[in-house]
A protein has these predicted regions:
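Conserved N-terminal entry element of GNAT/NAT acetyltransferase domains
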Residues: 2-56
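Short amphipathic alpha-helix that is part of the acyltransferase structural core
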Residues: 44-79
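Acetyl-CoA-dependent GNAT
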Residues: 74-121
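A conserved beta-turn-beta hairpin within the catalytic core of GNAT-like acetyltransferases
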Residues: 115-124, 133, 185
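A short, internal acetyl-CoA/4′-phosphopantetheine-binding micro-motif in the GNAT/acyltransferase core
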Residues: 125-135, 160-161
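Conserved acetyl-CoA-binding loop-helix of GNAT-fold acetyltransferases
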Residues: 134-149, 169, 173
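Conserved active-site alpha-helix within GNAT-family acetyltransferase domains
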Residues: 139, 162-181
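Conserved GNAT acetyl-CoA-binding A-motif
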Residues: 149-161
Length: 194
C-alpha cells in the first residue's frame, strides 16, 4: 500500500512528493541522525572505497548515469538523473546513497541507496556501471545497504523484476528475503531480513 502510494505521489503529484520528501528528511534526521553519524562500515570491498553520494560532485553523478546504456534503465527508475534531481537527493538526509569508487582509476563502479522513511522502513536500489558488471558488485552493494540499514534499525524492502536476472540473483545471494507480494509485470516486493 505504502509502496503504491509513494509511486502515485512521485509520478502524479510531484509538488506534494517534494514537500513530503523534505518533511521526511527532517524527521528521519531527528530519529536516526545520531546513529548514522556514528556509523562506520566494517570494511571496504577489496579494491573499492565506499563514499556517501553527498560527498561526490553532482556533475560526476550525472555523468555516471549518462554513461550507462539505455537498457540499464529498463528496470531502474527510482528518481531523476539530472543535476537538479541528484542535488536534491544529496541534500536529503533520509536518502542514504553510496558509491563504490575503483581505487585503481578513481571511476564510479556502482551506486546504491536506501530510500528511507522516518517510520523505520527503507527501500534499497542499486546500479552497477556497465564496465563493472559480472564482478559481484551488485551483491556487494546489497550487503552495504543491509549493513547500514540494519545497524540503524530499519526494516528493508526492495522491488525486483524476475526479468532482471542479474538484480534478482543479487538480491537472493546477498540477503535473506521474504516475498511480501507478487506485483504486476513479473515484479516481486521483497522484505530483506536481518
Amino acid at each position: 500500500m505504502l509502496y503504491a502510494l509513494a509511486h502515485i505521489l512521485r509520478d502524479k503529484l510531484s509538488w506534494l512528493w517534494l514537500l513530503i520528501e523534505k518533511l521526511n528528511s527532517c524527521l528521519f534526521d531527528i530519529r536516526y541522525g545520531k546513529k548514522l553519524r556514528g556509523f562506520l562500515f566494517k570494511e571496504n570491498p577489496e579494491g573499492y572505497e565506499i563514499i556517501p553520494m553527498r560527498d561526490i560532485p553532482t556533475e560526476e553523478m550525472v555523468s555516471f548515469f549518462s554513461q550507462q546504456p539505455e537498457e540499464a534503465f529498463t528496470f531502474f527508475h527510482p528518481h531523476g538523473f539530472d543535476a537538479k534531481s541528484i542535488k536534491r537527493l544529496q541534500q536529503n538526509r533520509s536518502f542514504l546513497a553510496y558509491i563504490l569508487r575503483d581505487k585503481t582509476n578513481g571511476k564510479i563502479a556502482g551506486y546504491c541507496f536506501n530510500r528511507s522513511f522516518f517510520h523505520g522502513q527503507g527501500f534499497r536500489g542499486r546500479m552497477v556501471d556497465i564496465n563493472y558488471r559480472g564482478k559481484g558488485l551488485g551483491t556487494t552493494m546489497n550487503k552495504i545497504l543491509n549493513e547500514v540499514g540494519f545497524a540503524i534499525g530499519l526494516r528493508l524492502f526492495e522491488t525486483v523484476s524476475k526479468d532482471n536476472v542479474a538484480s534478482y540473483k543479487s538480491a537472493l545471494s546477498a540477503s535473506n528475503i521474504k516475498v511480501v507480494k507478487e506485483l504486476p509485470d513479473n515484479d516481486l516486493y521483497l522484505e530483506i531480513l536481518p
